[in-house]
Amino acid sequence: MRKLIILALAAIGFAACSNQPKVMENQAINTIMTRVSVREFTGEKISEAQLDTLLRAAMAAPSAINKQPWAFIVVTDEAKIAALGEALPYSRCSNKPAVAIIPCGDLSKAIPGEMANFWINDVSAATENLLLAAHAMGLGAVWTGLHPDMNRAKMVQEMLGLPEHIIPLCVVPVGVPAEQPEIKDKFKPENIHYNGWE
């Protein structure tokens, strides 16, 4: 009898707990909160289906006036990945990624005139989608910047034969993680200001 009472109380307790809102149980929120920058890879290949999913996720991003002013340079050639790593040591392309994806702004698709630089916002949103998709699929990735350093951007343009209207925003190495970086809580209440700066 005592055992039955204990089991009943445990069941009631579990039911009560399960009714409490738990944000981290939401898969999308959990992916956002647990994403980390992965800089070391095993060298294993990823499948075409995985690569397709990454690029579809990137292109699902919002863009100003729905211009979608982006292009994605997908580098799978090992020699070219190594060359990127040599030219851009911070890019982590020497750390055995399966692929290096370079999100770019396509100025021929950008909003004309004074709003042309909105492509930076748009391609940044696409890049974040790419990072989140990689994490959700059990892959690792890291955002390594090029733009607005036009010397770096120009170097990549020349290395990959990109036309002048295709501006590389960053290099994103993607692969099977060889490390598990610590998940950090970056939330800081002092960064929040309601109804103005107070």
Name each region found by the language model.
Residues 1-24:
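Bacterial Sec-dependent N-terminal signal peptides
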Residues 16-198:
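Acidic, surface-exposed loops and disordered segments
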